[in-house]
Amino acid sequence: TKEEIDNVTKWDSYRLQQVTADSFEVKKRTGHEECTFIKANWGKRSKGLMYIADEIKGTAFCMHNFWEKYPTSIYADGLCTDNASLTAWMVPPDAEAQDMRHYDTVAHDQTYYEGFPEIGSSAYGIANTNEMSLFLYDTVPSDDELMKQAETVQKPSVLVATPEYYHEVKAMGEWSLPSKDTPLKKWLEEELDKAFAFYKNEVEQRHWYGLWDYGDIMHTYDAQRHCWRYDMGGYAWQNTELIPTLWLWLAFMRSGREDIFTMA
C-alpha cells in the first residue's frame, strides 16, 4: 500500500571515503540531520566513482588516484529531493586535520644533512594537483559500464611516441637508446632496471601514499635501520630538488614502459 511505501526508510545521503591507502568505507544517513551516518559497506582500494540518478538520467563523478591520495571522499546528498548533489573532497570535513608543522623545533643540520633553520619547514606556497571527471547519462548505465568508466579515469589512454622518435628529435637533449652490445652497457642497463624496480616496490612497501606523499619518493636509505632516513634532518622526501622526475621521464622515453610513465 501507499502507506507502507511511505514508511520505507529513505536514505538521503551517502559518503564514500578512502580512509587509508588500504581501506575505504561507505556510510549513509536518512534525511534527518539529527540522525547519524551508519556504515553501509567497506573495502580496500576504491576506484573513486559515485553515481546518482532518477528513473532515467544520471550523473557520475570520479576522482583520479582516489585511493592513492587519501583521505579523498565523494558525498551524495539530497537523494530524496529534486535537487540531489555530488561533492568531491580532496580532504573532507570529517577527515583528520592536515598538520603542516615540522617534527622538531631545530633543523639538525649540524648532525645529519642540510636543514635551514632560518626558514624551517613551512607549508607556504605548496600546491597539489588533482584530476576529476564528470559523466552525464541519458540512460541508466550498467554496473559494468560504471566500472569501465572508473578504470578509464584511473588509467586513461595516453598518446605517446616511440623511444626511437623521442631519440631522433632529441626530446630533453642528448641521450642514448638502450643497448646491451657490450658487457659494460649490459650491466648499466640492468642496473637501471633494478633501480626502477626497487623504487617502484618501495612505493607499495613503505606506503608512500596520501595527499601529500603520493607521487614523491625518498632518498638516502639507512642500511642499519632498514628504512629511509625520513626522520633525520634534511633527508627524506626528494620532491623535485633531487630531480627524480628527470630520471623517470628519461627512463620512460628510453623504454616506452607504461609503469615508468605512471610513476613519473
Regions found by a protein language model. Give the residues of each.
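Soluble or luminal CAZymes and related metallo-dependent hydrolases
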Residues: 187, 240-243
